[in-house]
Amino acid sequence: MTQTLADMRRDYTRDGLSEAQAPLDPFTLFRQWFDDAVKTEQLPVEPNAMTLATVDEDGRPHCRVLLLKGLDERGFTFFSNYESAKGRQLAARPYAAMTFFWPSLERQVRIEGRVERVTPAESDGYFQVRPLGSRIGAWASPQSRVIRDRAELENLLAETEKRFLNQAPHCPPHWGGYRLLPERIEFWQGRPSRLHDRLDYRLQGEAWIRQRLAP
C-alpha cells in the first residue's frame, strides 16, 4: 500500500440538506434521492444496492449487500431464500436495518424497522419477471448451506435445468420477498470538514417526526 488507511480521506463539496429543502414525508425525500442516484451513479454501480443488517438468535449482527426491488407507502421490498442465513435470522428476529450509499452524490440513507414477508402473489409476480437463469438458480442453490465444491453446485444446476427443460419454473416455496416497514429513516449529506447534515425521521404513531442530528 502506497498510502496508509489513516491518510485515506477526501472532503465533501456538494450542497447541504436543510429542513427547508426536506419534505415532511421521508418516503418523498427517499424517492427524490433515489431518482438522483439513478441519474448520477455510473455503471457498474447499482443505485438500488443496499447493505442489509440482521441479528441472529445470539444477538450477533450479520450484514450483506442486496438489491432493493420494491418501494411503496408500506416500505422497502427485497427478495431472498427463506431458508438462507438471513431468512432464518429474520424468522427468529424480524427486525433489520438497511443502508444505501451513493458516493457520487455524497449521500447515505439508513433505514430501520420491522420486517415481514410479502404475500405469495407478490413473490410470484416478481419471480416471473426475473431472468430464466435466476429463476432456475433459486431452485438449484441451497443458499447458505455448506457444499463440497463448485462442481456440486454446477451439478445441482444441471439437474434443475433438466427438471424445467419443458416447463417454466414457478416460484419455489422457500423463496420470496420481505418488506421492511420503516420506523426510522436517516438522511445523511456529506459536508466540508466532516460537519455533515443529518436529518432523522422517526415514526410516532402514524406521523413522522423530523429532527436534526449532530454529525
Curated annotation (Swiss-Prot):
Reaction catalysed by this enzyme: pyridoxamine 5'-phosphate + O2 + H2O = pyridoxal 5'-phosphate + H2O2 + NH4(+); pyridoxine 5'-phosphate + O2 = pyridoxal 5'-phosphate + H2O2
Class of enzymatic activity (EC top level): oxidoreductase
InterPro entries: Pyridox_Oxase, Pyridox_Oxase_CS, Pyridox_Oxase_N, Pyridoxamine_oxidase_dimer_C, Split_barrel_FMN-bd
Superkingdom of the source species: Bacteria
Needed cofactors: FMN
Binding residues for FMN: R64, V65, L66, L67, L68, K69, F79, S80, K86, Q108, Q143, S144, W188, R198
GO molecular function ontology, one term from the record: pyridoxamine phosphate oxidase activity
GO biological process: pyridoxine biosynthetic process
Entry-linked SUPFAM superfamilies: FMN-binding split barrel
Residues reported to bind substrate: R9, R10, D11, Y12, K69, Y126, R130, S134, R194, L195, H196
Cofactor remark from the record: Binds 1 FMN per subunit.
Keywords: Flavoprotein, FMN, Oxidoreductase, Pyridoxine biosynthesis
Associated pathway: Cofactor metabolism; pyridoxal 5'-phosphate salvage; pyridoxal 5'-phosphate from pyridoxamine 5'-phosphate: step 1/1; Cofactor metabolism; pyridoxal 5'-phosphate salvage; pyridoxal 5'-phosphate from pyridoxine 5'-phosphate: step 1/1
The EC number(s) this enzyme carries: 1.4.3.5
Pfam name, any one: PNP_phzG_C
Function: Catalyzes the oxidation of either pyridoxine 5'-phosphate (PNP) or pyridoxamine 5'-phosphate (PMP) into pyridoxal 5'-phosphate (PLP).
Subunit structure: Homodimer.
Family: Belongs to the pyridoxamine 5'-phosphate oxidase family.
Protein name (Swiss-Prot/TrEMBL): Pyridoxine/pyridoxamine 5'-phosphate oxidase
Source organism per UniProt: Ectopseudomonas mendocina (strain ymp)
GN (gene name): pdxH
